Each structure stands twice: as C-alpha cells, then as structure tokens.
C-alpha cells in the first residue's frame, strides 16, 4: 500500500489553533510530555498514510494525537517527574489522565476536538483487551487509537524519563514486537504493527532528528504543526 504525502493547509482552523495552544500549555508545565506529544502526532500521520487513509484524515489524526496526553495537566508534577518507578497507587493516578483528557476535550461539537477527545480517552487500550480505561478489544478500538497507541509506546520507550534512560531504536522495536514486562506482542493491531515495522528505518531517523533537546522551544517560538509535518518526511 502506497503512503500518501501530507499537504499542510496554510489556513489554521480553530481546532488546529486549539491543538497548538493546548500543546504549548502542556510544554510549559512539562517539557518531556510535550516533545513526546509532538513526535507522536507526526508519527501517527505517517502511519495513517501508510495504512491508506486520505491526507486530510492523516492531518486530523495528527492534530488529535498531538493532544493524547493533555489529561496529564491534571496529574501532580511530583508524580509525572518522579525520578524512580511509580508505586501501584501512583500508577493508578497516572492512568486517570485518559479520562481527564476526554473531559478537557469533549463536548465542543468540533469534529477535530471530538477525535482528540476519543484518542485522549482510548490511546492506552490494547488489541488483546488488557488496556485501560475501558478494556476495549480488537476493532472495538478505533483505528486512530490503534495507530496512536503504537506511536505512543515507541516514543515513550525511546525517550529519557526521570527514572530511566531511553532505549535504542533496535531495543524499542524488539520490545514492541516481542514484548517484555511492560508490553505484550498481542497489545497492538497486527496490521498496524506490520505497517510500523515497514517504516522502522524512517521512524528511527525521524526520532533521531527530533529528540527532546532538538525540539526544545521549537513549537513555542512560532513553528506551527503544519511546518513540523512538512519537514518530517
């Protein structure tokens, strides 16, 4: 299946402006979360195109995926930035970010923000039904969420976190494909996983060119999501 190239619009819609503003708010509070969100948005667009979705839908998914962690605005920073593994109670608090994100983004009537609300709510659902918050399984999970889920996990594995160093591309792909104590092979849609493996080299190159250090201050100084997308592939 041939990937479709994104053609960013020059006119920012209200929902696009909202996505950028919310992303900047999140960056101001937690730079780690922001760099992660920006990369997930771009990777989701690329993967959606590879799966045959039209360019307009790829852009919509990208903008929505950019806000997938917006619910972390409600989570105490001392938990998000804790320099050691979380307790079971703290992990339970982290998991509430999906419902908080849905609450923040839903009810506007704007199709883009409603998609963002859906992704915020269900990007941690798993194909095998072991995810949260609703334990959805298989195609009960929307395709935008199945796409965002694998991009989210890949980027989280690569990224340095307060309590651990990021993985190499090779190790991150090994975990995604084979599983470990955090993941299982059955948690991803097989078709989405296959497509992601097909662009493994591109994904590695994109991440290497857009680490947290290289993205620092980039979006908040006037660079729009359109320009990030245009420069991605």
What do these predicted ranges mean?
Residues 5-233:
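Histidine- and acidic-residue-rich, metal-dependent catalytic cores
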């Amino acid at each position: 299946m041939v990937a479709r190239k994104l053609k960013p619009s020059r006119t920012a819609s209200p929902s696009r402006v909202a996505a950028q503003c919310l992303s900047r708010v999140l960056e101001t509070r937690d730079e780690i979360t922001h760099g992660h969100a920006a990369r997930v948005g771009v990777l989701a667009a690329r993967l959606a195109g590879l799966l045959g979705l039209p360019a307009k839908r790829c852009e919509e998914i990208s903008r929505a995926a950019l806000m997938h962690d917006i619910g972390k605005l409600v989570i105490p920073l001392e938990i998000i930035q804790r320099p050691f593994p979380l307790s079971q109670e703290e992990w339970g608090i982290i998991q509430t970010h999906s419902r908080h994100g849905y609450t923040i983004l839903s009810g506007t009537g704007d199709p883009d923000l409603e998609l963002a609300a859906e992704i915020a709510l269900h990007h941690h659902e798993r194909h095998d039904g072991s995810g949260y918050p609703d334990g959805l399984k298989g195609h009960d999970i929307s395709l935008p969420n199945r796409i965002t889920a694998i991009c989210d996990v890949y980027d989280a594995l690569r990224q340095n976190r307060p309590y651990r160093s990021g993985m190499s591309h090779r190790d991150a792909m090994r975990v995604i494909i084979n599983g470990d104590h955090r993941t299982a092979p059955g948690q991803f849609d097989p078709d989405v996983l296959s497509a992601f493996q097909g662009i493994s080299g591109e994904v590695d190159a994109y991440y290497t060119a857009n680490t947290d250090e290289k993205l620092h201050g980039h979006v908040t100084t006037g660079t729009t999501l359109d320009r990030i997308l245009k420069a991605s592939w």
